[in-house]
Amino acid sequence: MKGTLSVLCLVLLVSVLEAAVTKPKFGDFIGCLRYRTSPENPITDAISFADNTTTFLSSYVSYTKNKRFSTPNYRKLLAIVAAKHVSHVQATVVCAKSNGIQLRIRSGGHDYEGLSYMSSVPFVILDMYNLRSITVDVSSKKAWIQAGATLGELYTNVNDVSQTLAFPAGVCATVGAGGHISGGGYGNLMRKYGITVDHVIDAQIIDVNGKLLNRATMGEDLFWAIRGGGGGSFGVILSWKINLVDVPKIVTVFKVNKTLEQGGTDVLYKWQLVASKFPESLFVRAMPQVANGTKRGERTITVVFYAQFLGRTDALMAIMNQNWPELGLKHEDCQEMSWLNSTLFWADYPAGTPTSILLDRPSSPGDFFKSKSDYVKKPIPKEGLEKLWKTMLKFNNNIVWMQFNPYGGVMDRIPATATAFPHRKGNLFKIQYFTTWFNANATMSSLSQMKELYEVAEPYVSSNPREAFFNYRDIDVGSNPSGETNVDEAKIYGSKYFLGNLKRLMDVKAKYDPDNFFKNEQSIPPVRVM
């Protein structure tokens, strides 16, 4: 391990020195940072350089969640600025822009393609994890949350003052609020309350000129864009003001497995017909996954059904028996618990795990993984499901699964143009494809197998365009080089992520960042659309 780290540090040092030679303004950038920050809030301690390789490597890896992008040949990283004060963010934006250095903004590091912490041109990471304050006002049912705070921290802070308030966001506790909220993050409350951006009522953002703006000073067009269009194309999100939502003191959850031998395909087919029509207080996720069979060395598909009901077991059983008896849900399958404890259930923590784990911030990279997404408008026929199972079983020794996340409820009633997030009425469910592997040598074969699974699903999902979820970043749906933005290419991936909202997003980008400073391989281009 020590040898690997030494080599990694050496390559980092070489790459940074090479970048510094090719970017003589890097020294001016550092000088600019010091000039633009005050002695009361010095920025020096927030900067990690390659000449301090232990700190530099630790800073990079701590918020690198996909191991595919933790190897040195992927990056030309000059420095990491882990901002500790708003002035650090402002200075980093102004100084990077004035010195021609690309900026990548990282909140929690969960960008699936690493675009928040990678580039093929010399760049600086602006890390937001130190800006993590959360203020909850119970009387108004509102909260301010900084971009570097995690969902686990938000849920815990809310629960500390009220056990009957929550926020409709995701189930991964370590996800950062900055990117998750701006991309339209969702969770098991979406059928009842919608998604994150539907509950944002104010925001603070640093614009391309280093100015601190809120909803009143940024204008409604920019405020619309950062709610679902991804904040990283328009500026640096500092914080969000959100409306909290009501939940009962006790919710009910269940987890039921159905193998193919137990009729898993038939049960899942019926799920497609009923999941989006359940009462909006009920969310049932279906998760087909590769599992060990009954015989040694045999692999099969098990469909796992996870559910949350905003009520008690008896009421849930009545709904299930009437609408979906095929699942065979039993009273003993159900567990009643607080909403906060239900977040542990959804994250697959063992029973009895203390809720304090929601505050943990793992400091090592995750596994190698690849994810993709789809939206489904009509039920996938059983023969289509069987083709998907056959393809999933081709994966080598990977962990591989799909998540079917139901729509319906309030999602059908919010207009596609209400925010920049467009995927609303007309969807039965959203699919997430996911595979994990544990050896870098398996990367190419794993990516190829994921591509095959995605191709097999094509006849059964949305088309023209084939829609995709922005927060499940997927470079395969289209991309630009790190230092360029081709509008035609941007329209390819942009139309999949944002559908008819892309034109308005491009107009907003042209107004607020006409020189395209805030860019990455899948950013919004600054083009006025007539």
UniProtKB/Swiss-Prot annotation:
<dbReference type="InterPro" id="IPR016167">
    <property type="entry name" value="FAD-bd_PCMH_sub1"/>
</dbReference>
<dbReference type="InterPro" id="IPR012951">
    <property type="entry name" value="BBE"/>
</dbReference>
<dbReference type="GO" id="GO:0005576">
    <property type="term" value="C:extracellular region"/>
</dbReference>
<dbReference type="Pfam" id="PF01565">
    <property type="entry name" value="FAD_binding_4"/>
</dbReference>
<dbReference type="InterPro" id="IPR006094">
    <property type="entry name" value="Oxid_FAD_bind_N"/>
</dbReference>
<keyword id="KW-0560">Oxidoreductase</keyword>
<dbReference type="InterPro" id="IPR036318">
    <property type="entry name" value="FAD-bd_PCMH-like_sf"/>
</dbReference>
<keyword id="KW-1015">Disulfide bond</keyword>
<dbReference type="InterPro" id="IPR016166">
    <property type="entry name" value="FAD-bd_PCMH"/>
</dbReference>
<feature type="glycosylation site" description="N-linked (GlcNAc...) asparagine">
    <location>
        <position position="441"/>
    </location>
</feature>
<protein>
    <recommendedName>
        <fullName>Berberine bridge enzyme-like 4</fullName>
        <ecNumber>1.1.1.-</ecNumber>
        <ecNumber>1.-.-.-</ecNumber>
    </recommendedName>
</protein>
<dbReference type="InterPro" id="IPR016169">
    <property type="entry name" value="FAD-bd_PCMH_sub2"/>
</dbReference>
<feature type="glycosylation site" description="N-linked (GlcNAc...) asparagine">
    <location>
        <position position="341"/>
    </location>
</feature>
<feature type="glycosylation site" description="N-linked (GlcNAc...) asparagine">
    <location>
        <position position="257"/>
    </location>
</feature>
<feature type="glycosylation site" description="N-linked (GlcNAc...) asparagine">
    <location>
        <position position="52"/>
    </location>
</feature>
<keyword id="KW-0134">Cell wall</keyword>
<feature type="domain" description="FAD-binding PCMH-type">
    <location>
        <begin position="73"/>
        <end position="247"/>
    </location>
</feature>
<feature type="glycosylation site" description="N-linked (GlcNAc...) asparagine">
    <location>
        <position position="292"/>
    </location>
</feature>
<dbReference type="Pfam" id="PF08031">
    <property type="entry name" value="BBE"/>
</dbReference>
<keyword id="KW-0964">Secreted</keyword>
<comment type="similarity">
    <text>Belongs to the oxygen-dependent FAD-linked oxidoreductase family.</text>
</comment>
<keyword id="KW-0547">Nucleotide-binding</keyword>
<feature type="signal peptide">
    <location>
        <begin position="1"/>
        <end position="19"/>
    </location>
</feature>
<keyword id="KW-0732">Signal</keyword>
<dbReference type="GO" id="GO:0071949">
    <property type="term" value="F:FAD binding"/>
</dbReference>
<comment type="function">
    <text>Probable flavin-dependent oxidoreductase.</text>
</comment>
<feature type="disulfide bond">
    <location>
        <begin position="32"/>
        <end position="95"/>
    </location>
</feature>
<keyword id="KW-0325">Glycoprotein</keyword>
<keyword id="KW-0274">FAD</keyword>
<dbReference type="GO" id="GO:0016491">
    <property type="term" value="F:oxidoreductase activity"/>
</dbReference>
<keyword id="KW-0285">Flavoprotein</keyword>
<dbReference type="GO" id="GO:0009505">
    <property type="term" value="C:plant-type cell wall"/>
</dbReference>
<feature type="cross-link" description="6-(S-cysteinyl)-8alpha-(pros-histidyl)-FAD (His-Cys)">
    <location>
        <begin position="110"/>
        <end position="172"/>
    </location>
</feature>
